[in-house]
Amino acid sequence: MSIEARLAELGVTLPAAPAPAANYVPFVVSGNLVHISGQISQNAAGLIKGKLGVDVTVEQGAEAAKCCAISLLAQLKAACGGDLTRVVRAVKLTGFVNSAPDFTDQPKVINGASDFLVAALGDAGRHARAAVSAGSLPLGVAVEIDAIFEIRV
């Protein structure tokens, strides 16, 4: 099944790729790898803000991470010239979780992105990963995730 068909089955429509918030590019294609800059937690309603262990639950954080993954796929689609059939696999995610000092469930939060990528890409969505605590994130968002994908050139 194609990525587009899986997304439709999941009820997900990719948004336009978000514009960078500062002096950087949203992605770099180097050889057969696409390095995607950090995507912050946002949806159609706006930024998903807050701190895990204070005012955001693990479940809400996982949903925020899923929103980051949707933005990652939007950037990936742009990097592939709109053709997601070029995607070979997800390679690596690095997830940053805006966390209270005693919060230790960062992996459960970033599972929201990992689970979504496996659902959207099948086995090609399985990836290496880091889930890291952050004392704060840009614009007060709950989650930020960057990624590396392999594509056909």
Where do the language-model regions lie?
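Short, polar/acidic, helix-capping and beta-turn segments at strand->helix junctions
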Residues: 1-153
